[in-house]
């Protein structure tokens, strides 16, 4: 009788253990080496080939209706803004593209996966990882520190300017002085100011112009607002902390170790240059708003997705701390569907009703997205699909998994 009483407890523990194992990918997952990536047929890994084919057709059928010319696409998206003029590079995009990665292997691909296209706000996920690297290496002590304490006066680089050097203090106002790295990462800072010719209120302004300028600021952490001026202020602050261009940091600590190719570029604006240790350095942008941001191919996006699937670990090497990934996946109080930029969460099933609660997505305009699903050891890169079709795409991919 005593043994029988213990049996339900044992079964419950076994069930709990099994569920926890489903929340993270298998230890034997394949990691692609530089310059190559093994392909497997869906059926060889137990997937339904017909369902996979249906998901690809769905992606093609639901191609984004925005123009492929990104100059026109930006105008249609942001043309109502008072400071909508592009100041960074914009490029025409390619065809609808994607790859499906299961247990590390590519089981399907379509479009032009080698083409380096703008990825828009997926760039923000790369930016937050670079901030995380600074925390991991002790350059930033903790994310609850104020940003201002880490910044010197910043000299703008303008070789045509013959007068005294121009200095900027982006975190010196009474409101900005108390902003922490955490609220900047979560887009709950309500940072105020103008950077690279773009005022904070000029990004996605409301319908009442009289409220654009001079309004009372929201207390940090209380209101979530997607705002690229503030993202770019974070990128500038992070550049100062690293004392080097952020693309070099990303290349050294993330992209080279995961075997990314040589065609990705992280661009800034033509006027976003500072003097850093006597050298001109471009402060990159956190997305494609006004141009710039990350230009990258689908394969390299997939490698980054695999890195985040494995909580910062690449084939046994911890590139970004698991603690940082955990923080990135912690819901923001003012917007529980958002962690650190640009880790969109599914904890309430609102983003992707068809996906598991612990799935997350790196999303950029276009729509470009990297779907990461630890419960199924799955990553999907989908580019240039209608935003409303995201869940339908994920639903069809998941239908192929037994």
Predicted regions: what they are:
Residues 18-113, 137-140, 400-402:
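N-terminal leader/targeting segments and the immediately adjacent pre-domain N-terminus
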Residues 48, 104-106, 118-143, 184, ...:
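Active-site SXXK
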């Amino acid at each position: 009788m005593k043994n029988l009483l213990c049996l339900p407890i044992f079964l419950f523990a076994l069930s709990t253990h099994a569920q926890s194992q489903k929340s993270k990918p298998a230890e034997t997952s394949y990691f692609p080496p530089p310059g190559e990536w093994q392909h497997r047929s869906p059926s060889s890994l137990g997937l339904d080939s017909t369902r996979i084919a249906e998901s690809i057709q769905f992606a093609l059928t639901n191609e984004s209706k925005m123009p492929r010319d990104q100059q026109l696409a930006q105008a249609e998206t942001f043309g109502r803004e008072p400071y909508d003029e592009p100041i960074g590079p914009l490029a025409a995009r390619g065809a609808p593209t994607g790859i499906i990665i299961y247990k590390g292997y590519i089981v399907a691909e379509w479009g032009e996966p080698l083409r380096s296209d703008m990825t828009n706000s997926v760039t923000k996920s790369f930016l937050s990882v670079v901030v995380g690297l600074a925390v991991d290496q002790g350059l930033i002590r903790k994310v609850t520190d104020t940003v201002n304490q880490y910044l010197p006066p910043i000299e703008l680089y303008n070789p045509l300017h013959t007068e005294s050097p121009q200095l900027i203090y982006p975190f010196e106002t009474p409101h900005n002085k108390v902003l922490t790295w955490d609220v900047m990462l979560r887009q709950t800072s309500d940072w105020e100011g103008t950077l690279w010719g773009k005022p904070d209120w000029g990004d996605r302004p409301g319908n009442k112009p009289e409220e654009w300028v001079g309004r009372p600021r929201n207390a940090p952490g209380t209101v979530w607002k997607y705002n690229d001026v503030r993202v770019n202020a974070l990128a500038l602050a992070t550049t100062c902390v690293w004392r080097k261009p952020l693309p070099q940091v990303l290349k050294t600590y993330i992209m080279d170790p995961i075997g990314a190719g040589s065609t990705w570029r992280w661009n800034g604006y033509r006027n976003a240059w500072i003097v850093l240790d006597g050298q001109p350095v471009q402060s990159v942008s956190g997305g494609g708003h006004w141009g710039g941001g990350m230009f990258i191919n689908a394969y390299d996006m997939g490698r980054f997705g695999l890195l985040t699937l494995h909580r910062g670990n690449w084939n046994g090497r911890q590139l970004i701390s698991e603690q940082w990934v955990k923080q990135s996946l912690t819901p923001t109080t003012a917007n529980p569907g958002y962690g650190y930029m640009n880790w969109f969460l599914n904890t309430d099933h609102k983003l992707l009703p068809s996906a598991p609660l612990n799935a997350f997505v790196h999303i950029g305009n276009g729509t470009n997205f990297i779907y990461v699903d630890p419960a199924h050891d799955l990553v999907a890169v989908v580019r240039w699909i209608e935003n409303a079709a995201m869940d339908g795409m994920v639903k069809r991919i998941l239908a192929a998994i037994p």
